[in-house]
């Protein structure tokens, strides 16, 4: 039928609307993404492509927000290594997310606290990991609301590393 495309579009639009807030289970969000991708494959020249891309972006942002909140939870509960793993996964999964600066910022805070609370034999290595995270934000994102604080942390980390380099 000549209305199949339109029916499929209204179906995915409805599935998209069933996607819950990021704080809830995201099974419906993942399903919506799958269905929108299926629509785009089935109808590559559809008049609904722009709307589908807007829906996809919003759904992906919701998944990224959920993963960022998990990363922040690990940081806030002093689960330093879990936060590092969550950050690595976030960077791999959402490389182009507008939430990337915030994710890097929390990795900086996490690594800074982790280094400060570490045993002496681990401090230099952990301060270097913190400095790497600082540089990742500073180099990849010119001006963010986190830049000033991250620059201060980077400055302190460099001072801490000088102590270990002079031993």
Q: What kind of feature is each model-predicted range?
A:
Residues 1-167:
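Acidic, polar-rich low-complexity tracts and alpha-helical solenoid repeat scaffolds
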């Amino acid at each position: 039928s000549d209305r199949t495309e339109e029916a499929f579009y209204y179906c995915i639009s409805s599935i998209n609307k069933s996607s819950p807030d990021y704080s809830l289970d995201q099974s419906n969000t993942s399903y919506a993404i799958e269905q929108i991708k299926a629509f785009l494959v089935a109808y590559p020249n559809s008049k609904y492509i722009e709307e589908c891309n807007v829906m996809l972006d919003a759904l992906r942002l919701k998944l990224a927000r959920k993963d960022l909140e998990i990363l922040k939870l690990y940081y806030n509960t002093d689960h330093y290594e879990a936060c590092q793993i969550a950050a690595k996964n976030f960077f791999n999964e959402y490389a182009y997310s507008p939430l990337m600066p915030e994710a890097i910022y929390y990795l900086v805070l996490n690594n800074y606290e982790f280094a400060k609370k570490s045993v002496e034999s681990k401090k230099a290595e952990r301060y270097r990991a913190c400095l790497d995270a600082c540089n990742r934000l500073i180099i990849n994102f010119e001006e963010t609301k986190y830049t000033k604080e991250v620059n201060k942390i980077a400055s302190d980390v460099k001072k801490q590393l000088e102590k270990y380099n002079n031993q």
